[in-house]
Amino acid sequence: MAEKDNIIELRGVTKNFEDTCALDNIDLEIRNGEFLTLLGPSGCGKTTILRLISGFEKPDAGVITLKGQRMDDAPPEARQVNTVFQNYALFPHMSVRENVGFGLRMQRRPKDEIARRVHDALRMVHLEAHADRRPRQLSGGQQQRVAIARAVVNNPLVLLLDEPFSALDYKLRKQMQLEIKHLQRQLGITFVFVTHDQEEAFAMSDRVVVMNDGKIEQIGSPQEIYEEPANLYVARFVGEINILNAVIAANHGDGLYDAVIEGVTFPIRSQRTFAPGDKVNVLLRPEDLRVYTLTEDRPAGPHLTGRIEESVYKGATVDLIVTLSDGRRLMAAEFFNEDDVDINYNPGETVTVSWVDGWEVVLPDGEA
């Protein structure tokens, strides 16, 4: 995405709830027209950010701006921001059509405009046929989709979504991810999405904000977050990761080092600066590893030796658990090819493990 003006900025924002620090001196810039996801475990502060942006909470310190204007004390109704929360908050006495059009009626929009926009919103969430039903006649997933339609129909500058797909089944959740992303591109407005689901965040987002304990750990594109984690917390949170302890043996310059892993010297690459003797962690995703049996031709170069502990068929991939000589376990993922007999491994079989040069991520030892 090209660089754009910021529509929302949080500068030095802190929020406490009694003795708990929900947000600790947060700085965050949200770009106009982007799909930004706040990703993290329960209690990390991601929903608190949504509530501060929407005006349902006030910061204890710091500044929040919308289009350059301070919004610290502005009530929710004065902000061009709509929110979809986990609880649906639908009016039980109104039909689906009336629920979706409620905000437009409060704005005294023309009836034909209301009818058109409500119809378009319901079509987006595949509920046109349910327009005259009451919320109690809908499933939980359908009620959540009504809430999304009600928020989108007002064409806000910013739409905030707090885990809106939590009530949906797997298939519908996948479908709604595509629909919401498509809708966001159509409308061109900023979406701020909250989830604890890494796959969901990566599928929908232009940028992802990884949070932990009231702080931001990393901001970047899904690819940056996955392939270039800033620290061990991010690396562990966004997927399976293998962590190998290593010691720098030599610095050859231009980011090329020799590192000793399990008594074997490997070439590694990093933009960070290390000195011989430094302890580091070498991070490798399961799909980065290459596993070879002793009867296979393998590329020349250093390798680790271990035994197959488990082989798990997952359809598109086969996950291998390899136990090294020191007892450390590695997970490798190989794409399944039914014509490739070499992908069939036996428990206890001796194998060698290596990886493509430069695919590793290197972090200082002890970096959280």
Swiss-Prot record:
PROSITE patterns to which the protein is assigned, alphabetical: ABC_TRANSPORTER_1, ABC_TRANSPORTER_2, POTA
Membrane-crossing segments per the record: none
Enzyme class: translocase
Compartment list: Cell inner membrane
Keywords: ATP-binding, Cell inner membrane, Cell membrane, Membrane, Nucleotide-binding, Translocase, Transport
Role noted for this protein: Part of the ABC transporter complex PotABCD involved in spermidine/putrescine import. Responsible for energy coupling to the transport system.
Protein name, entry field: Spermidine/putrescine import ATP-binding protein PotA
Domain of life: Bacteria
Catalytic activity: ATP + H2O + polyamine-[polyamine-binding protein]Side 1 = ADP + phosphate + polyamineSide 2 + [polyamine-binding protein]Side 1
Chain's gene name: potA
Summary of subunit composition and partner proteins: The complex is composed of two ATP-binding proteins (PotA), two transmembrane proteins (PotB and PotC) and a solute-binding protein (PotD).
One cellular component term from this protein's GO annotations in UniProt: ATP-binding cassette (ABC) transporter complex
